[in-house]
Amino acid sequence: MREHGPQSPMNLPAKRVVALAVLFLAVPVAWAQNPRVEFKTNMGSFALELYPDKAPKTVANFLQYAQSGFYNGTIFHRVIDGFMIQGGGFESGMREKKTRAPIENEAGIALKAGLKNELGTVAMARTPNPHSASAQFFINVKDNGFLDYREPSPQGFGYAVFGRVVEGMDTVLRISKTPTATLEQHQNVPQRPVVIESVALKPAK
């Protein structure tokens, strides 16, 4: 199985597979303020602020998963210190959860609106197909500009940023430093599961 998510600069493939994806057409919702989502994990809590005006379909998709309870009990299954932490698709034991149809990649419009893959931002994980993101996401623990949109090609489409950590970055960094190992075909899996215990909308500030 191909790993969902970005690859570090030292592990980028020379060629990527191009495939058509079914697009999930999320209806943008008008927000008086940017929504905030609190994650409680077994290693501490953190909060994300989301930007529906800059990545509307991506935010609508993420909130639908969050509000349905989909992320509760999932794990951060791929952790690379000095790069990013990735979660939202597997339960303990690397049991993959069934997701809805993938969504359109908004990396280009998000970049034009000022959202970049930099320290503390959250973006959608995907396969080599640019339009394959569904539920998995990652949080950058350093500036990763090479993940930003460059051109409309499989190699250049980038990863859509849709929010940033506004509370608990110390928790995110602590997760990024957890020891990892290879579990079957999955690399960079925390040896001690990092469990997302709950995800909830919180009042915007």
Question: Where are each of the predicted segments found?
Answer:
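Bacterial N-terminal signal peptides that target proteins for export
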Residues: 3-19
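Cyclophilin-like peptidyl-prolyl cis-trans isomerases
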Residues: 12, 24-205
